[in-house]
Curated annotation (Swiss-Prot):
Residues 788-811, 893-912 are annotated as: Disordered. Belongs to the RSE1 family. This is Pre-mRNA-splicing factor RSE1. The lineage of its organism: Eukaryota, Fungi, Dikarya, Ascomycota, Saccharomycotina. It is found in: Nucleus. Involved in G2/M transition. Required for pre-mRNA splicing and endoplasmic reticulum (ER) to Golgi secretion pathway. U2 snRNPs associated protein required for the pre-spliceosome assembly. The involvement in ER to Golgi secretion is probably indirect and due to the splicing of the pre-mRNA coding for SAR1, a small GTP-binding protein required for COPII vesicle formation from the ER. Belongs to the SF3B complex, a U2 associated sub-complex of the spliceosome. The SF3B complex is composed of at least CUS1, HSH49, HSH155, RDS3 and RSE1. The keyword Nucleus applies. Its main location: nucleus. One of its GO terms (molecular function) is U2 snRNA binding. Transmembrane segments: none annotated. Residues 789-808, 903-912 have a biased composition (Acidic residues). GO terms for cellular component: nucleus; Prp19 complex; spliceosomal complex; U2 snRNP; U2-type prespliceosome; U2-type spliceosomal complex. Gene3D superfamilies: YVTN repeat-like/Quinoprotein amine dehydrogenase (2.130.10.10). The gene is RSE1.
Amino acid sequence: MWGGGKMAVVSLSPHTAKMRKLFGQASTTMAYDGLKREAERRTRSDHNITMVAKDDELYLYHLTLKKQTNFVHSCIGHFVDLEAGSKREQSQLCVATETHLELYDTADGELKLIAKFQNLFATITSMKSLDLPHSGSRAKASNWPTFLALTSDSGNLSIVQIIMHAGALRLKTLVNQPLTRTTLRRVSPISYMEIDPNGRCIILSSVEQNKLCFLVDYAQKLRISSPLEIIRPHMVTLDMAVVDVNFNNPCFVTLEIDNAATQLSVHLIFYVLELGLNHIVKKADYLVNPSANFVLSLPDLSRYNITTSLSDNNYDADYDTLFNPFVVIGFENHILVKDMNGFFSLKVEIPKRSITNSRHKNVTIISGIVQKLKNDFFVLLQSNHGDLFKLTVSPDTNDRNRPLVQLSYFDTIQNSHQLHIFKNGYLFALSEMNNNFLFQFEKLGVEKNDFSNVLTSKDPNKSLVFEPSIKLQNLSILSQQLNLNPSIKSQIVSDSPLSIATKHFTNNKIITLTNAVNYSNLISTSLPPNATKLWLIPDPATTGDNNTLLFITFPKKTMILQIDNESMEELTPDEATRSAFKLSQDTTIHTCLMGSHSIIQVCTAELRHIVPTGKSRYSNKLTWVPPAGIRIVCATSSKTQLIISLSNYELVYFKIDVSSDSLIELTTHPELDTMPSKVAIVQDTQHADLLAIADNEGMIKIMSLKDQKEDFLTVISLQLVSEKISDMIMVRDSSIGQLNLHVGLENGVYMKFHIGDVDGSFTDIKRRFLGLKPVSLSYLREISVSLNNEEEEEEEEDDDDEKEEEEINSSGAKWMSCVVCHSSSTWVSYTWKNVWTIRQLKDQNMLSCSKFVNADVAINGVCSISSSGRLNIGRVSNFPTLDNWFHVHESSVNKQENGGGDESNEEEEDEMEEEMEMLQISTFRPRTILSFPNNPKSILFIDNHSGKKQCRISLQIDGECLKFGSSDHLYKILDDIDCVSAAIIDFTRQADHLIICAGDKRLLTYKILVNKDKLSFDIELLHQTEIISPIHAMLKFKNFLLTAMGSTIVLYGLGKKQLLRRSVTQTPVSITKIVSMHQWNYERLAVGDIHESVTLFIWDPAGNVFIPYVDDSVKRHVTVLKFLDEATVIGADRYGNAWTLRSPPECEKIMSNHDPSELSNGAIKYPLDVITLQQKLPNTYDCKFKFQLLNHFFVNDIITDFHILDSLSNSDRPGCIYMGLQGTVGCFIPLLSKGNVFMMGNIENIMAEADDTFYLDYESRKKNNNMRKEDDEEESGSVVLQGRHGIEDEIICEGSCSILGRDHQEYRSYYAPVRKVIDGDLCENFLRLSLNEQEFLAKNLKSVQVEDIIQTINEVRTNYM
């Protein structure tokens, strides 16, 4: 399955093999395969392919399932109008990692996600918001949104606008100004960026030597000028800030180190842009303390009645003296407020923690923000300990209103990379290594006259020691954004649905990522046995909005439950009402509500038309009985139509008269040539025009129901699926208006067809293997795809239904219809943003379900019959989409069971504890995550204490943490142990053993004891084993422990008093430190060295030793590796590359024909060229053979784990899931057919060349249309903003499709050329283009339609994962 001919074989479990066999049988006869092969054939003949597929090569498709979360850039502004006529408040927040952007809205006091944007395929180095607040009347600045200015390793300065286009938010590039060469360089001016507060200029700086300044002209057109350069050799920039100077000449300040100086010297330099002279002047240069690391500008102090000159007041000073900006400089243990003219140097010591609360003696400032009030301002500064300090500058009335600096402790939060204060009183803290938080100001700290807690510049050497607050004093948490950076280790909990367990680095919570639709159960009750199907319809006999009738069918029996807002009880008011329904001696096959208040009950022997006669009272208005000996097989209905099929091959068509509420039978009964087994029409419509009919031979017929036309009740199209159909539903997708037919087959395959409204044709055929049981279908309408777990909790807390509905509508909930598929497990099929998705339902297997609405469950309610026969009422949420493929569940091992007490006090304590837990930085850090050899759903977590030699063990089974022994703790503390590595080995079948390598060169062996009845675990120390060096890699090898001590491979067995050495293998001298190992079938061993790439060993049972026989010719700094097959290894290095290596065919031929013992005794006759090379280059050829490089790909994250799965969510192929250090989750999927490789390669090519394609087309249209001469003379990189026009009317700059202008091929080949890996992230960007753009690009693939490309891209997520 991983390529390479006969040698590339992945062993499959019997269950997986059986599923794949059934899937193959089900899919071979489908018409889709023929269409796809034809499309691929046309593609190969009409387009020149750059990727040539060979039988012995491995082609991989890469897809990022969860983007990295190392957020390092943020800015605030009003980027896009979410609602027409909305107030333009600076309440939107844009955050960015190195590769992508996310936009949030904070107006309602929460981080509400607006949009996640495409992968930019570049490394963002800086990002700032560009506002046009003072552009004059001609530019109408109030109509301009906030723009984004970005620099990246593309070497460009990019100005980007967020626009609404085709119903979706997208990035539009306005400027791509070339600055320097690509990639990251010390002298490239892309590391620092500041923008004048009035939007007049953009200042860029490199780490060393170069600075650029661009003037921004926005009087009529948005332009940037040619750059003004500052070149200062040997000067290294530490920090940079722009100064608020109102309408004076723009000014910015830098901290720079002089590399040419003999001693370390740090300079504070003020630069002023002389607008009249178009020149930059170095206005001031001061030598400051070498410990300086931070600079922040202050507002114009003269506006706050503060004297900024040496004269008594500001009016006596000349212009040069009056123009005197101030900055705050951060040093070790103190700060300095200094002005440009050198009049003031106001020093204040930074308050220090007490010794017991501080592990670091020195205190430095890492971030800060200025907040202007109506008549005042203040500054928040954060130290490296996370402490926030409030700094104020006020006029000293005792010293001629000269500036007086005061510094006081404010609060303690996690370390932040950037701080932002919104106008509505919210504080956002961006953290690279922690979660991001949105706070609300409760108060503004201590009073200025509280001198005991305030340090001032009057006493610059005075120090202050304080105790940091355990809980927040001046802030409260409103919302948080989960970050998984860094992610040290992960484990696969389940492959169907895909579930990954990891640990949060700072708060040590267990994070579970699940690719499934979440289901939360609210009510559960038992039912009589053998319940098969249910229907929920509004109760026409009551006036309540949420009163419904629930019909549950059993063999020869029907139960009716009446549900209102407060209760659910069986409907048994009187005998007359009971006689209206058919409750016994027959099976209900269909129930619906037609007209205004008519209930239709269809049983196998009769049809009943029931109407209400009073509150909870009903009467039978009509009973329709088929001819003698004939039974009703199936039925379907819309709001006014009812169709039933009979066992004599006839269809009976009914229509309801809305005025009289009478059911009218059509006298003509169409007769079919085969017995209909299933019929389906659109349920939630007044009149359906098409009827789908399925028989037992797998034939689907489409019959016209257009009663005004000649083809009424005649078959207009056919489709054969060559398998018996178990269920069928017809649904009209409201988002795109398509009519879809959903079909479940007896062999466990689900199919979806697009039905033509006019001719009933079958197109866009999709299918998915769901399980081994026949597929039955249920329909859920008006489901909100945007509902998540947090909104569920808020909804449960809100008792007011109207208020709740308003909140839901204001949150921008999007509605869709979905089909629930019931087989061996339950799946949900839905279409979101024109992308079809089918995912499993988490932790719930249903037999039948229906939409449920109640006062307590306003949206996404589901009433269902579970596979265990219980009636459940719950809610579905967290629908996986392209942007949110996983939903996240957090659980803490720090929680303990609470005893009884006052509920109100407990709630307050819980809220306080929850807030403290959010901000708390755990003293334990995750070290490793282990799965049990025979039970992958059992996960063991090992954490190390950050301050002392101590580790913590916790165990989770099926997502639930077990208690340790008889205690209430969910963990076991091991003292005097610092875990370096660990493994779980089953030396015997009776027990699992935990082996921990401690930092003091000990191997500790524990016996793991699990009590599933009491949900508890324990570990028992058996013995300790002394070792010569710490072990960084260990794994199970047969019934032994395989370890790597430095460069030596040692095999241990279980002894009574210690571990016993069974084998010792000395590796080649080039191997110095083994950091990763993996074995294949207990025969081969792949060893990854920290510098020397991968070496392949084979186990020699006779010599009881491992023999090296293949190594690499390229040095690779391995972080992790895994076997794909016996000859192929996938690995990753610390530079963000992933690669696969394969042993050469001649080597595999020798291995297959010889015993491993012959490798060492010289019995094998190697080829002459191999012997010659080894004699000439003995240092290079430690092994006689070298790996062949199959694939190479840059993922821009350090991969920490690979997980090889035989099948992802019942798919038809294996997959490789990886997790990166920065929180990335991705996968590599093998492409098994040449046609698939060609098609995917073509899609990648047209997307990679889209920048050139669009720009060349724009230039061609510009030339043909004879555009104005003044536009032709515009400078390179400038852009004209002419409002919102169509794609054809827009002015396009180079690199606009890729946003930042980074070449995709160069990006994915950052360290080495990309090889035989297709970038699915780039291919999926095709789905984000408008229809016009898609059609334009598809022209490059002749005879291939846009629908073919979309279907090919979508097939990866639906069928391969």
